[in-house]
Amino acid sequence: MSKFTYLESPMTIRGKVYRNRLIAAPTLFAHSVFFLPEIAENVYRMVENRAKGGFAAVSTGELPVNNEEGTTLFMERAIDMDDYDGEDFKMVKEYADRIKKHGALAYLEFSHEGAVAETKAPYVPWGPDAYVREDGVQVYALNLGMMEKAHV
């Protein structure tokens, strides 16, 4: 008998059935498929193999929460997630399709680099308060409208 009694037991959380207690952590930016097309198939396959290997849930890695204040490294343009028939949405959906094909739950890791964001143009660090970081970089304060974008 395993000393991890429940590791391989299914469980239900908020109506979603996890086939076991194993969750694959993210390993690469989800948005890498947008900006490094030459590695896209390898990234999709890496994520798919985790689902195929038996994980109950698989993360795709970071995807920025918005295209203004929530930009992140390697983001060369805005990602359009509003057009469900558009290429950007299809590229993210490809992760979910490959993961779900093997019976695992797919999830995205949303990211917002906040006050520690990259400072090279077009990146600007945004945080809960305005201040100057130790490295001399100005951090701008998010306003209520900016914060509400995450809840849309």
Q: Model-found features: residue ranges?
A:
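Flavin-dependent oxidoreductase catalytic cores
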Residues: M1-V152
